[in-house]
Structures are given as C-alpha cells and as structure tokens.
Amino acid sequence: MPIIDVQVHPFDRNHPGRPWASPSHGLDSATGEEMVAAMNSVGVDGAIMVSSFSAYEYDPSYALEVYNTYPDKFRVVTPVDATDPAIDDVVAKWAARQGARGIRIRMRNGLPMDADHPGLNRAFAAAAKHGLPVNLLCWGILDKGLPHIQIGRAHV
C-alpha cells in the first residue's frame, strides 16, 4: 500500500524572483527536490502539497512548479479567498488544472471567522460541485456552525 503524506508545504528560498509574502518561522526552504529526498529517505511514496500561504498567499505557482517537476510524487491543494465574489469561477478553474486535488480555506487573520459567512458556503458548494475536498484551517472555531460538514481533525 502506498504511503502518502497528506499535508506538506513547499516553498523556495526567499529571493527577488519568488519573494515571500511574510517571513518564515523555521526553514529557509522546503523545495520539491528537498521534499522528494526526505520522502525517499523514509519510504513515503507521495504527498499532497498545500501551497504555502505564509510564503505565497493565494498564488499556487510554486507548488504547481514542483508538481510539474515531480508529477508521480505530488498533488496540489491551493488556498482560496472565500470572500472573493468570483469564488465559484476560481474553484472551477482550479479543479480543471492538472494535479489539483483540493482547496484550502483559512478562517483567521482578517478572513471570515463566522461559519455563516456566505463566502464560505459558496466555496464549499463550489468544491462539492467539482468534487474537490476542502482543507479547512479554523483554529479555535471548528464546531461553530458547520454541523453538516464531515471534518477530519487529525494533524500529526
């Protein structure tokens, strides 16, 4: 049975060609090459990359670059802005991309924290329409109004 890491965050070093949106609180990089070497060293067959919001915000281009280099190792989840009025189109375009496997919604730091926010409902509906799972970052507010959503809570 293949061993899959379900959440890794790829990012290149901070440089003018690919500047970070905010500083890293740890590694200088977690490139595709570094990830593949680490995965191979411990017998991990593949991974789901969640594009690094702290490095690139809503731009998944680095994760897609890694996917294009190692399509046999990775699939990609991208952060989406649930407040974007065009969220339906954003999710539809993402779903059509080679390697796309899900979306990530962040409910923190100035973004919708209310489970009843209409953008969240639109994002969930768009993901469901296109068969994409949702990776939900919602520290401290997980159960406040989304009883109909099946949520995996483990993060190890």
Stretches found by the model and what they are:
Residues 154-156:
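Conserved small/polar residues in nucleotide/adenosyl-binding loops
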Residues 54-142, 147:
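Active-site gating/metal-coordination segments in enzymes
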Residues 1-58:
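An N-terminally biased module of ancient metal coordination in phosphate/nucleic-acid-related enzymes
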